Amino acid sequence: FYSSILPNLYSYILVHSKRISTEALNSQAAALRMRGRPKVVLARTYEEAMEYYDKYADNILGVISDVRFPKDGVKDPEAGIKLLREIRRRDEFVPLILESSETNNREKAEKEGFRFVDKNSKKMNIDLRHLMEEHMGFGDFIFRDPKTRKEVARIASLKQLQDNIFNIPYDSMLFHIS
């Protein structure tokens, strides 16, 4: 499974990073932005995942986890749920995505407040990209009304933000910067 998702994940991150680097003022700034692009870290056990989480906790954009993998030296059918629960306990805001080929895990994920990706879906890569755009900051920045949660502005670049900053409702701006 990793061999199918990782190339798509890397490709998506690279495309997004290139898009951001084009907004740089000069080639040096563009190079710095490319070096600062998000990294993908692959853990094969619960313990390894927690080591990475502890090491990079302040810089994590989100966590994507399978359901079944080793924990305490034994394959655990709910290791991913336990992992995401522990991460949620430590950080209530980090986006968490559970992926599984077993559709009954969707209900478990939703009950815990995690996003879910079905590994059997023909559009799994599209679903994953959509979740990354929506919840990990890879897409446009969407300003929402703090009361209704309806979209009030969509910003795709720093130039667009500069051009529209005074058109964004004050309460929405405060909501997103606080």
Give the ranges of each region predicted by the language model.
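A generic structural signal for alpha->beta connector loops
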Residues: 37-39, 93, 113
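Two-component signal transduction core modules
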Residues: 63, 87, 116-119
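Active-site residues of response regulator receiver
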Residues: 64-73
